[in-house]
Amino acid sequence: SQNGNIEWLCFPDFDSPSIFASMLDREKGGAFGFEVSGDYRITQNYVPHTNILSTQFSSDEGEFVVLDYMPCYRSQDETGHYLPAELYRYIHWIKGKPRFKINYHPAPNYAQGQVILNITPQYIESYCSFDNKDRQYLYASLSLQDIKEKKEIILEKDEFLLLSYNEKVIPIDIEREKIEYCRTLVYWLNWTDRSKKYTLYNLSLIHISEPTRQAE
């Protein structure tokens, strides 16, 4: 949404059951976003020539940007693409001490059944009570307990959130997140550079012509 909330997401695939669906049901559909005071101004756009979404929050007390992207880049052997079922939310601190709460409310399997949330030192695991084969894992550089309890967070440096369909083998930290961001950014810049250019609506076409998220 325009305020940085994810209100519809089928996961891990495009035709999978939804895990966030507040666009259809505000009460129980599930969402993943940021809650700030009414003093904040929120603007949203895409990083030029990419499919990376930028949502900027600014007020007198501080400013930060949330960069949303799904990793996408050429594999090391150059025979295909690395396209994991993952969504990064890179929280880039700009100035001051901005405050917000994270609304992490997954509702797997179209919000049917009870949602089970398990918190571990590494992640928050979620799944549906009567269909637990599909699970989601939220990794973060912020306190997982604060996220689960929806406590106010004061941002003083860059942080990240990672929603993954799989448990991560490689430890995830902010430096790893920045590497994934840079790889994805370069991929999109190269992809758009090779694409046909149009006089009108060129940037809009980038966002509706995304390559399929399946390894080639």
What does each of the following model-derived ranges do?
Residues 1-205:
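Terminal accessory carbohydrate-recognition/targeting modules of carbohydrate-active enzymes
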Residues 206-216:
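Single conserved hydrophobic/aromatic residue that forms the stacking wall/gate
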